[in-house]
């Protein structure tokens, strides 16, 4: 007996209003992004000269039918105030608002909590983007696929290695129709190397009923607790109502919604062959920086520094930064506001943040130099390259520091002629001796 899929009436193809939601998380999330997230929320960390969330917003602004964007998370409202004010000037055709959750509600729970605001004006489609994703965001192509297939949901997918696939949500799809047949979040065994990229397009009249159904399933589930003896049998079934209701409110798209959509909805996947990676750990900002800079170079962005004998493109230099003409930069380097790079310095595959100093004849490779940090003369700060295709986020493996990007937190000082290799250095540390493969507390 074949499964009968209910079909909605075909839309007229013109495409109605669309809204976008960017999920930004909160202070208790993104802890793997430390020490950088100790001073700046991860969504506002600069990658390729702009906050991570700016890249999402730029892609959204290129979808003509989107005029409203919501940032949903549980940071303090003041955190995004300046960003929203600046973005209103840069993206005048898009209204941007921050909606603060009273607690962490999950990727679907936050959407459902603010459903009235999102559904105001009766949008036809809703984009949902995770802010910690680095990709080209083919939103117009996803919208076109949704209209062609009369889809109720479209997920962005990409291919990764078989070994890496089980770290993500895995998609089984029909290669001809692109229909999603099965979805499993982080399966224990290999199912597919087509994975969830964390970018979704939902029909507005399907998304919230699907979340409501997931909440109902969670609420109706028998509330049983383990017990140690017959003496506490009666009390073992008594679960604190506040604790239980709090758990019921945490609803996640990946674990609670997408699997059911694959079973009974018109659910399709748009597979991208362009770049994609997550920005989970602090070190993952370096390959993301390279990918965004390469994209800017391909699009002929005027933000990039013009190539020269000492500028190997792509390189971003903030207008307020000071770079000596004899310093050599690139490829894939971002220099932040008021940073200084002195004579004879070499910077490659790195991010130099606001007010940092790179003194003369020093060398910075595969590293992030934190805000107001200083790299002394003739010093060498070096990390290990992370392949763009690698999705490993481990910092320590078997008790040993994994060789990876070197990160200096805020206001760190590396002395003259000091070598720092494969280290993570927490803020306000002064390094007076050579160090390698350490987390410096």
Where do the language-model regions lie?
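Conserved N-terminal catalytic core of the sugar/cofactor nucleotidyltransferase
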Residues: 1-41, 45-141, 402, 419, ...
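Eukaryotic N-terminal low-complexity, Ser/Thr- and Lys/Arg-rich leader segments
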Residues: 1-18, 90, 120, 127, ...
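Glycine-rich hexapeptide-repeat left-handed beta-helix
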Residues: 25, 344-441
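Short loop/edge segments at beta-strand edges and connector loops
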Residues: 73, 100, 130, 155-157, ...
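Short, hinge-like loop/turn segments at secondary-structure boundaries
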Residues: 86-89, 117, 145, 170-176
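Catalytic-core segments of class I nucleotidyltransferases/pyrophosphorylases
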Residues: 123-127, 134, 140-148, 160-165, ...
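Long, charged amphipathic helices and adjacent flexible linkers at domain junctions
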Residues: 293-321
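C-terminal accessory/binding modules appended to enzymatic or scaffolding proteins
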Residues: 316-317, 322-346
């Amino acid at each position: 007996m074949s499964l009968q899929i209910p079909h909605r009436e075909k839309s007229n193809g013109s495409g109605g209003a669309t809204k976008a939601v960017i999920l930004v998380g909160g202070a208790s999330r993104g802890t793997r992004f430390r020490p950088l997230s100790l001073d700046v929320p991860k969504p506002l960390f600069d990658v390729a000269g702009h906050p991570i969330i700016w890249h999402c917003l730029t892609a959204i602004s290129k979808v003509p039918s989107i005029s409203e964007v919501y940032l949903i998370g549980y940071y303090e409202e003041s955190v995004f105030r300046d960003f929203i004010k600046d973005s209103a000037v840069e993206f005048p055709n898009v209204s941007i608002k921050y909606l603060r959750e009273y607690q962490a509600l999950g990727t679907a729970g936050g959407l459902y909590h603010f459903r009235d605001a999102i559904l105001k004006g009766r949008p036809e489609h809703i984009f949902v983007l995770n802010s910690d994703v680095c990709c080209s965001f083919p939103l117009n192509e996803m919208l076109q696929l949704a209209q062609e297939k009369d889809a109720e949901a479209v997920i962005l997918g990409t291919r990764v290695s078989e070994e890496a696939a089980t770290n993500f949500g895995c998609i089984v799809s029909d290669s001809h129709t692109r229909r999603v047949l099965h979805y499993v979040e982080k399966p224990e065994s290999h199912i597919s190397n087509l994975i969830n990229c964390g970018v979704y397009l939902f029909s507005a009249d399907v998304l919230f009923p699907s979340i409501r159904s997931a909440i109902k399933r969670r609420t109706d589930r028998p509330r049983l607790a383990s017990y140690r003896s017959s003496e506490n049998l009666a009390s073992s079934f008594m679960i604190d109502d506040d604790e239980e209701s709090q758990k019921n409110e945490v609803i996640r798209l990946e674990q609670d919604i997408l699997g059911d959509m694959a079973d009974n909805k018109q659910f399709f996947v748009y597979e991208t062959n362009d770049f994609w990676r997550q920005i989970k750990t602090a070190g993952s900002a370096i390959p993301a920086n390279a990918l965004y800079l390469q994209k800017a170079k391909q699009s002929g962005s005027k933000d990039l520094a013009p190539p020269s004998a000492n500028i190997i493109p792509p390189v971003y230099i903030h207008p307020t930064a000071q770079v000596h003409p004899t310093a050599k930069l690139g490829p894939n380097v971002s220099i932040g506001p008021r940073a200084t790079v002195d004579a004879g310095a070499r910077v490659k595959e790195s991010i130099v943040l606001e007010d940092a100093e790179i003194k003369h004849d020093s060398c910075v490779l595969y590293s992030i130099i934190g805000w107001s940090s200083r790299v002394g003369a003739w010093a060498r700060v070096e990390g290990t390259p992370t392949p763009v295709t690698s999705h490993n986020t481990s910092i320590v493996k078997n008790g040993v520091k994994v060789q990876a990007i070197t990160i200096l937190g805020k206001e760190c000082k590396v002395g003259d002629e000091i070598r720092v290799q494969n280290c993570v250095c927490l803020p306000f540390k002064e390094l007076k001796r050579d160090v390698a493969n350490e987390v410096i507390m």
